[in-house]
Design a protein with these regions (language model features):
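Catalytic cores of DNA base-excision repair glycosylases
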Residues: 2-215
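Polybasic, lysine-enriched low-complexity intrinsically disordered terminal tails
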Residues: 1, 206, 210-234
Length: 234
């Protein structure tokens, strides 16, 4: 089987096994998505979701963030790692959004990556979930799943993205990204992957997985191990 065909079958299999896969950050607006993704760096989504209701209520739009000092955000995000740096980035990004984009989150990669606190991965996540462009953002889970499946040996996120993007049509990049995140969190764990509960075990190379752990498992769909997602939109 050609690698492109296998990649397509993997995405199909994961989509069948995990029909509810979606972003787990809570947001209602484009700006809330951007802020939540910035805050999620090196932090679990659940922790971010605990912090953002108060933050979003206090700063309802880009103008509110732009008029604030980074310290004004601290009480709302103090529980998150690197909160001082993230608060500063959010304020600076909001000021640029106000001045350069009329208060609206830009919908192109170059414009997003020009904002403080926004790198390639963050921009890709925002583009995917705004439906504004095709991207395959690579986080820890996406990188691990891509390597375990045997599609890449790369550890650098940009190289993983390049090799995976070459195996899938652009219109499937965002879907594959979200499925790999969901799969990595629920089944393909870093230390003890649940190969028996994997919906695509028959297509997986199990690269780097000890033989004692990499039991064949069922090739058909499996149900996600955790509860349904919170209110983040697909």
């Amino acid at each position: 089987m050609k690698e492109r065909d296998r990649a397509g079958k993997v995405v199909d299999g994961l989509a069948g096994a995990m029909p509810d896969a979606r972003i787990e950050l809570d947001f209602r607006t484009d700006l809330e998505l951007l802020v939540a993704v910035i805050l999620s760096a090196q932090c679990r989504d659940a922790r971010v979701n605990e912090a953002t209701p108060g933050l979003f209520a206090a700063f309802p739009d880009a103008a509110a963030y732009a008029a604030a000092r980074p310290e004004d955000l601290w009480p709302h995000v103090r529980s998150l790692g690197l909160f001082r740096n993230k608060a500063k980035a959010i304020v600076l990004a909001a000021r640029a959004i106000e001045v350069e984009h009329g208060g609206r989150v830009p919908r192109t990669r170059p414009a997003l990556e020009a904002l403080a606190g926004v790198g390639r991965k963050t921009a890709g996540v925002v583009l995917v979930h705004l439906g504004a462009g095709h991207a395959f953002p690579v986080d820890t889970h996406v990188g691990r799943v891509s390597r375990r499946l045997g599609f890449t040996r790369q550890t650098d996120p940009d190289r993983v993205e390049a090799e995976m993007s070459a195996l899938l049509p652009p219109e499937r990049w965002g879907q594959a990204h979200q499925l790999f995140v969901w799969h990595g969190r629920r089944t393909c764990h870093a230390r003890k992957p649940d190969c028996e509960g994997c919906g695509v075990a028959g297509l997986c190379r199990k690269a780097g997985v000890p033989k004692a752990t990499a039991r064949t498992g069922a090739a058909g769909p499996s149900s996600p191990r955790r509860g349904s997602p919170r209110r983040g939109r697909p």
